[in-house]
Amino acid sequence: MIVVGLLTLEIAVRDAQSLKDKRQVVRALKDRLKNHGLSVAETDHLDSWQRAQVAVAAVGSDATVVDSVLRRAEAEAEEQLAGDLVDSSIERLV
């Protein structure tokens, strides 16, 4: 069975003064998470310069492994964003 896991990150980019500033923060996070073989995309608040929503997807055959990978990605995002992570959720799509 194929298991798809989705991690959604709500980010407040408090130090951003422009869309360019926000995109630098989002791009750095996306690049770091993509190094782990995850699919990453900015999915909401595209025109807001102090908010972002990033979705991270993982696919596998074992739900436990997919959940573990997404929890590590969540921890890494929290570490990199240094307090700017407002909310996160993990869901499994079967």
What label would you give each PLM region?
Residues L29, Q50, L81:
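RNA-interacting cores
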Residues A58-V94:
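C-terminal structural segments of small proteins and small subunits
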